[in-house]
Regions:
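Sigma70-family region 2
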Residues: 8, 35, 46-63, 82-83
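DNA-recognition helix of helix-turn-helix
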Residues: 138-162
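Arg/Lys-rich amphipathic alpha helix in sigma70-family domain 2
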Residues: 59-60, 69-89, 151
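Internal acidic/polar
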Residues: 78, 83-111, 130
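A short, charge-rich alpha-helical start-of-domain segment used by transcription regulators
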Residues: 2-28, 41, 52
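A short pre-motif secondary-structure segment
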Residues: 120-124
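Short amphipathic alpha-helical boundary/capping segments
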Residues: 7, 15, 105-114
Length: 165
């Protein structure tokens, strides 16, 4: 009887609900980190497979979200360092870029940033996380997150100015 009550109290953490609520966020973060749709799909699947193993230990909805993002970062890091990944050659999925179409895409410019800056920008501006939340998720110092955001903004500013000339 006690375990049934515990499951009802942890309704927010049920894998199906977590997937419906956070799958898009997890996928977008994976895509920002890998720049590849199929790798992002693999990471999304791996994240929720890992989550299914531990979902009953979640204490609050904030813990669910933080854990999913942390697993996403770890999975994307693992993918980049795997021997399989090192032996593969990626295809350019954007065969027609926005530059060829005569347009300017801020997302294209963000995707050109180094991964640490790209991740911080995505979590801060696209997901709406505070500096402290990003620091907790990435397990880095809040001042490091601020530095990443400042440098990313400077790089984007220079790119935009160069494109305007």
């Amino acid at each position: 009887m006690n375990s049934i009550t515990e499951v009802k109290n942890k309704d927010f953490a049920m894998p199906e609900k977590a997937f419906l609520k956070y799958a898009d966020t997890v996928y977008r973060l994976a895509f920002v980190r890998t720049k590849n749709k199929s790798d992002s799909d693999d990471i999304l699947q791996e994240v929720f497979l890992r989550y299914i193993k531990v979902w009953q230990k979640m204490e609050s909805e904030e813990h669910v979200k933080a854990m999913l993002l942390r697993i996403t970062v770890n999975c994307s890091n693992s993918l980049k360092t795997s021997s399989w990944f090192k032996k593969t050659e990626g295809l350019n999925e954007n065969l027609i870029s926005s530059e060829e179409l005569g347009g300017f895409s801020l997302l294209d410019e963000v995707m050109k940033l180094p991964i640490k800056y790209r991740t911080a920008v995505h979590l801060h501006y696209y997901c709406g996380y505070s500096v402290n939340e990003i620091a907790d998720t990435l397990k880095i110092n809040p001042s490091t997150v601020k530095t990443h955001l400042i440098r990313a903004r400077a790089m984007l500013k220079n790119t935009i100015k160069a494109d305007d000339l």
